[in-house]
């Protein structure tokens, strides 16, 4: 039975596959260079589309966190809420931006290109059915064993009256979010494999808006009549926001002809291949999130001289949330746009094109994330103060969160590069190597965190630094393994470009620091002064960085600007022409 309905016509599906077919990528050595270059630029353009959508997602995510900060501050209630959200949120990062997409997209692309759209659609239905069954069971187990999970992740919560019990309630309330986000991740994979990037990238925006909107309605407006506390309403809002994230993608799937039909065939070779890639990929792609969980365990036991045991978990969470803005904007966007292209190259056996595309993607990641990390470190206090401070989020919270943000920023480039490198291994049908590196990095993180807290006495800042060290460790090790396996990744050109970006970023750091210091002396440290600092210092830093890149011959900077502004300008021209 066809699953891609003929109602839309075969051209509707074929027309969406605008990237070069695998067969055309090997039509002669002489043409490959041009096509490889074209594919690399196509990846950057696709990343631009994704990045604009991801920008909206991250901005609305910050809006959600800002509302939470003002309502609950950084303390017992938000610590418990964040722990309850962390388990399904970990799964979101693994599925939506990692393991499922990395395992499903190459397999689905292979079926779509070599076996036809009906075979590919049947595979998609098999995966969706399996997810409903498997993840549904996991959700049930999570609700039952919530107390044990909370104790495992945050043993220090039991020392604060009421904190452990609230965290258990939050965990049980938000666990169904896991199933919704798993299905949303698969829908994202189908659309990305069909070269539809904007709609799935916007899905997280609808989650953010839905979670805060439903949460405010249920927790504040209707809370008294429904006998819900504010934090309980926000927890239910998370689940409803997850449902909205899935529903947003369904119309485009329908227009492509996709119809869900329950299908059972556990021996299907495509499903077996996906699970074979996915199980180790969960570990191989989970280093950052697992290390955050390890750090949560450590953070729950830290005694702050001012706040006691309430605060460190919240400070780390708020800081890491802001870190996700450039990470999602650049790292996840490049990974989402790169994976289908390198999957086609790997399926066609065209390793020259594979190397070119991967090198271009990594170079673009460093071009965008290195200056971002410098900006986060230099302007951390102004960023956190302008966005979070107010209500129950006090000046002391701003100071402690900005310290964590500065140390997280050290590993930003490593975080983002891992988003591109891990899928490259999966495209080569190798999930074992990232898994082993990830397991090793978890041990490195545990040892580093022990040193930072016990020996150095750095508190929550040491935990942020240990996470960054692990991200850089994982990137360097995976890069070297992949370089040897595929015979190079244009390493000299890549290193030369990164060196230029580092130099430009250092000059930018000096200019931004001078600007920020001048604004502080002029206006002080009020929230208005923080906003003024960002309005003045960010453009100064960007202009200096752009000028240095042009002076050093970093031509990719113009390509990046074009890629990330074209979607907006095209939409603006379309509206003005109406």
Where are these regions (language model features)?
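Membrane-embedded alpha-helical bundles of multi-pass transporters/translocases
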Residues: 2-578
